Regions:
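A Rossmann-like FAD-binding core segment of flavoenzymes
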Residues: 95-141, 155-156, 164-165, 171-172, ...
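Cysteine-cluster motifs in flexible loop/terminal segments that predominantly coordinate metals
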Residues: 1-39
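Flexible loop/turn segments at secondary-structure boundaries
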Residues: 6-14, 25-28, 55, 77-81, ...
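Beta1-alpha1 glycine-rich phosphate/pyrophosphate-binding loop at the start
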Residues: 48-112, 178-222, 233
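Glycine-rich dinucleotide-binding loop and its adjacent helix/turn
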Residues: 23-39, 104-107, 113, 141-197
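Ferredoxin-like iron-sulfur electron-transfer modules
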Residues: 32-49, 54, 85, 117-118
């Protein structure tokens, strides 16, 4: 998919990783093979709750091991955050994380797939599966953070948005500050997307670069080119001190 997490592993001096192939780098240490899976000697059922990348991968591995798998997703399509993020500028190829796994699961006779299935605890327990895998993801927080990356205060203003709100189309206002404490690709591409949609966007981050960790994936120059092309103002080594719903204080 071109995410370059593999080359980032080399830059970081850690074992190689791969978004598409979870066994990469673990062939010898854990004996994992990308295509050969040890069949279970105790056939049983598995319920996977959540159809994002992790849930799809868990269902696929369990099915290849010989389990009877049911995977349930609350939304009307598979893919979770990777499906949403693939709609951002330059991210379309990331959809293949979802596409391959959905296709592979659809070819297997021991897999049942259900969308629009919001399961609560009672429904999960009453389903009667021998094994349950919870892959329901997480939500972005609305908080102020210290320089040590510790949340110090909530930002409970209606004008405070997270990436989840961006994906859901809930962002309002014409002049927006994107405060990036994640430091990877998402803050930059969200700022780019909002600018493309006609917003006046300022990007701020405590790091020394916009989307600083993309240095590891060899993408940092492209981040700056995209933000400059869309007229996004960039402020690095800048922290968000407060926001009262009208004015943001940065320093």
């Amino acid at each position: 998919i071109g995410c370059n997490i593999c080359i980032a592993s080399w830059h970081d001096g850690v074992p190689v990783r791969c978004t598409q192939n979870a066994t990469a780098g673990e062939e010898w240490r854990r004996g994992w093979h990308p295509e050969k899976f040890t069949k279970t000697d105790k056939p049983s059922s598995v319920l996977v709750v959540g159809g994002g990348p992790s849930g799809l991968e868990a269902a696929l591995v369990a099915a290849r091991q010989g389990f009877d798998v049911t995977i349930a997703e609350r939304d009307d399509d598979w893919g979770g955050r990777v499906l949403k993020e693939s709609q951002l500028p330059g991210m379309a190829s990331w959809r293949r994380v979802r596409d391959y796994r959905v296709w592979a699961l659809s070819q297997m006779g021991n897999v049942s797939m259900f969308t629009n299935s919001d399961l609560d605890c009672d429904a999960i327990q009453s389903f009667g599966a021998d094994h349950i895998a919870l892959a329901t993801g997480a939500q972005w927080t609305r908080s102020l953070y210290s320089a040590l990356e510790i949340p110090i205060a909530p930002l409970n203003k209606p004008q405070v948005f997270t990436p989840d709100d961006v994906f859901a189309g809930r962002v309002t206002g014409d002049r927006l500050l994107v405060f990036d404490f994640d430091h990877y690709y998402l803050g930059g591409v969200i700022a780019e997307q909002l600018a493309i949609s006609g917003k006046q966007v300022t990007y701020a981050t405590p790091a020394g670069h916009a989307s600083a960790w993309t240095f590891m994936t060899n993408e940092l120059p492209f981040v700056y080119q995209a933000l400059a092309r869309e007229g996004v103002a960039i402020h690095t080594t800048t922290n968000l001190i407060s926001f009262d719903g009208v004015q943001a204080i940065v320093a």
